[in-house]
């Protein structure tokens, strides 16, 4: 019995590896390389930061829209969907890599200055509260949430926390998305990004927001319809 369960888990993992992880890894790496090659500036660290940021954002958006798209197709929505989970894993890997690279773009070798003012700058409160500081602080909080979600995107965590606890934990992905959008908007302004970058960012963000909203209202409508049908089937209480 136990060996059968282990064998089933191994088979499921092999299928996820072949059908999800390898294609996602190859596609993400290819996209990063292509974007790196076409970016105009010569600075390698900036180009790598931008390439991983936009590919990571695309994967995060894809993770968030898989559920609503299944609802629109009237397909059953399981508690944990392997494709969504595996896409989220690669979004997390790229996002954390972007964080590590991004901390070396503007202030080489002095990453703490992304979050606190230099000593020679006179500020009563040492934490940066200008646009640059807020952009980096939202990015840091997003990276923290990303690490948490990445660490718990597995079957062991689902069993450990139980269904309600794991679902509550995974809902922090919406907070992650909000922080990512805030971080992105601030950097569009700080770096005075070109129209192409701004348009790409807005399209991806609005796609996720729109489909999430549609999925939310459809789910509520379906839940109300089910409750109504159950009440009609049971009949009025006497």
How should each PLM-predicted stretch be described?
Residues 2-238:
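Membrane-embedded alpha-helical bundles that constitute the cytochrome b-like, heme-associated redox core
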């Amino acid at each position: 019995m136990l060996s059968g369960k282990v064998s089933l888990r191994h088979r499921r993992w092999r299928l996820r590896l072949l059908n999800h992880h390898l294609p996602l890894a190859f596609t993400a790496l290819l996209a990063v390389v292509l974007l790196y090659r076409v970016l105009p500036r010569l600075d390698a660290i900036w180009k790598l930061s931008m390439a991983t940021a936009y590919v990571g954002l695309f994967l995060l958006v894809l993770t968030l829209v898989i559920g609503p798209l299944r609802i629109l197709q009237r397909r059953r929505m399981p508690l944990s969907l392997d494709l969504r989970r595996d896409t989220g894993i690669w979004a997390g890997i790229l996002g954390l890599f972007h964080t590590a690279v991004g901390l070396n773009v503007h202030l080489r070798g002095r990453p703490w200055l992304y979050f606190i003012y230099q000593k020679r700058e006179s500020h009563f409160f040492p934490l940066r509260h200008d646009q640059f500081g807020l952009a980096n602080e939202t990015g840091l909080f997003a990276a923290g949430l990303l690490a948490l979600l990445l660490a718990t995107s597995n079957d062991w965590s689902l069993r450990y926390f139980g269904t309600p606890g794991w679902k509550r934990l995974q809902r922090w992905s919406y907070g992650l998305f909000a922080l990512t959008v805030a971080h992105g908007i601030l950097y569009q302004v700080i770096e005075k990004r070109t129209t192409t970058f701004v348009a790409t960012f807005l399209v991806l963000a609005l796609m996720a927001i729109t489909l999430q909203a549609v999925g939310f209202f459809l789910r509520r409508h379906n839940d109300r319809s089910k409750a109504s049908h159950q009440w009609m089937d049971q009949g009025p209480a006497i």
